[in-house]
């Protein structure tokens, strides 16, 4: 399904991210539940951590609070802004997704220690099992969304 298309289309275009990647991310993160809150306290459709969301909101001049972080418009804007910054940093979809899930700090360590390649050619070597599965699931769903 491609829910919230008005926001996905708007922010995909604004931040230069492929719409289908955003749909695949939302599906993996919250299964399109705007009120989703994880055990780690990540929030909304794109499961943003409060601190990450706060930093992104400042850059976009958004006044963020506990309510509007769950607003699909705000959440998709910040989540898309975040994945765009990771795609820009790593220049590789798989590696950017790993960073979205496990954090840039971990991904930078994995690359510098040779655990994974910066070009994403060996994502099956991602040391965190959850992140490993996460990246492969999103890449699979991303391909499916491209066919729809």
Annotated model-derived regions:
Residues 1-148:
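Catalytic glycan-binding domains that act on GlcNAc-containing polysaccharides
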């Amino acid at each position: 399904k491609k829910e919230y298309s008005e926001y996905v289309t708007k922010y995909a275009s604004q931040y230069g991210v492929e719409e289908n990647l955003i749909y695949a991310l939302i599906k993996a993160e919250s299964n399109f539940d705007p009120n989703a809150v994880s055990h780690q306290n990540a929030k909304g459709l794109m499961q943003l951590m409060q601190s990450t969301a706060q930093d992104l909101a400042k850059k976009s001049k958004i006044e963020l609070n506990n309510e509007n972080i769950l607003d699909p418009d705000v959440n998709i804007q910040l989540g898309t802004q975040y994945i765009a910054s990771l795609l820009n940093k790593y220049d590789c979809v798989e590696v950017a997704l790993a960073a979205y899930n496990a954090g840039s700090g971990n991904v930078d360590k994995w690359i510098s220690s040779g655990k994974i390649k910066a070009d994403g050619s060996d994502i099956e070597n991602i040391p965190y099992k959850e992140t490993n599965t996460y990246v492969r699931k999103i890449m699979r769903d991303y391909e499916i969304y491209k066919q729809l």
